[in-house]
Amino acid sequence: MNQPIDIKKVFWSIPVSVYSTPSECIIKKQIKVSTTDPKELEEIRELLKHEKYYQEQEIEHIDNPEGRIKFKVQLKINVGLCKKDILNYRCKLKRAFFNCFVLIMRIRDQSGEGFKEMHIKVFNTGKLEIPGIQTDESLTQVLNLLITILKPIVGQDIDFIHDKCETVLINSNFNCGYFINRDKLYNILKYKYRINSNYDACSYPGIQSKFYYIPGLENQTGQHPPANEIHTASEISFMIFRTGSVLIVGRCDENVLHCIYDFLKKLLEEEYPEIGNHLNIIQPKKQNVKLRRKVINVVENI
């Protein structure tokens, strides 16, 4: 965004809607608080009394008037509910980051099938982290709604900087449709295609490889480039598993991703007679879904 954010002031001012609200809104917010002042802790507890639903996780509590650190409290505060809180029977409590707060935003799904939840991390510098974005339209939709919510709190001048948006990581996966002999494929990748690969079934179930993309090169081979070209090459990792699943991860744009996908698709088609595991086809077991009961108490007229 175009200005820093006072995370403590803004966090407590952001309205959290009830989970059952059928509209685009903030349904949950989260922050990590650290204080050495008992009065500040009382103020936080007083603010929490005005919230309909909250969860307070105590990470650290020191109250020793005779010690070097006389008083210190670290809290992780969750206000509101999201889909995971309701569907998951056991919600593992995770740690949070300082200098930021997290928002769970509900937006309309562009496919027209109801709503979906987006995870937004807002830092005190004004930087945003939004994982799970699949289209540019979804990103614009999230940013516009966030700015609309922040304007009454921060000021009408707040906006996001349009030319300072970057893709940090793209995760992509596909399945080739047949089971793979990993030992044979590992040898082919390493010695025939000369791609940097590593395979140890005891430590990781898939073949871990690195694809080096060199901009401007018409025929991309994925091999480690010479020393004079290494600074221009992009390193993208891909993993191939026994079941035929392929995972591509790394910092790249969509053109590079499609290039690697076409390379792997062609490789898996051409090497099928050698690496296809026709005999060891294991039918997946049918897993019986165990229904768990979770009790949610709704208290009205507070």
Predicted regions and their residues:
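Intrinsically disordered, low-complexity polar/charged tails and linkers
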Residues: 1-302
